[in-house]
Amino acid sequence: TLENFLDGEKSKLGNVLLTGATGFLGIHILYEFIKNEEGKIYCMLRKGKFDSCEERLIDLMNYYFDEDFSNLFGSRIILIEGDITEIDDFKKLEDEPIDTIINAAAIVKHYTADDYIFKVNVDGVINGIKFAQTRKSIKYVQISTISVLSSYSLNEKAYPNQKYNERTLYYEQDLTNKYICSKFLAERMVLEAATQGLSVKIIRVGNLMSRYSDGMFQKNYDTNAFLNNIKAIKNLNFS
């Protein structure tokens, strides 16, 4: 609740493992951490079409920001080539002094043909939780979405005049959309881990749009569901 947010104790992030650093939100989490925190940040990513993970991340940081962070690689920015869907890739970090995991990795396409979205958005979360549970001190932060509360209950008799807040998760809402369903299931996994003693936070993010300061938007803007909906409305002359 808001009261818990205002009255709760603020804990330091320490050294962070960040997944999803190549995404629009993830790269800004990385930037804000470097600018405002003192610890190291471990970024698990794939090299993609680039020759190395470092080359890929530097390319993205140069695209979004005017500052040069290349001198921080190897000292404050530690790169781990890996995939959150592979539990063995988390084992590469067994001896690293990680205090907090921030999971910003996800397939955010609202419409997909196969079930790979569940492998990333759900199984990837389970792997991160398993790694976090290997140490009592690790905190786990799950980046979720307000879309888990985006529909009315399919059973309005059981949930009359339902009011939604940050504590609401299941009210028999429509979960046929694979993206929404995957993020819902991920939240369930995180909350289950909390009952087992893991320190967790779930942050539900709204629509990601262009940066307020200068209008910069995500490089792969064509995958943004909200923007595609706006374009569809315009193309159908509903505007």
Task: Please give the residue ranges for each predicted region.
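Active-site beta-alpha turn of Rossmann-fold NAD(P)-dependent dehydrogenases/reductases
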Residues: 105, 141-144, 194, 206
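A structural motif corresponding to the C-terminal end of an alpha-helix
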Residues: 71-78, 131-137, 186-199
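Phosphate/diphosphate-binding loops
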Residues: 176-190
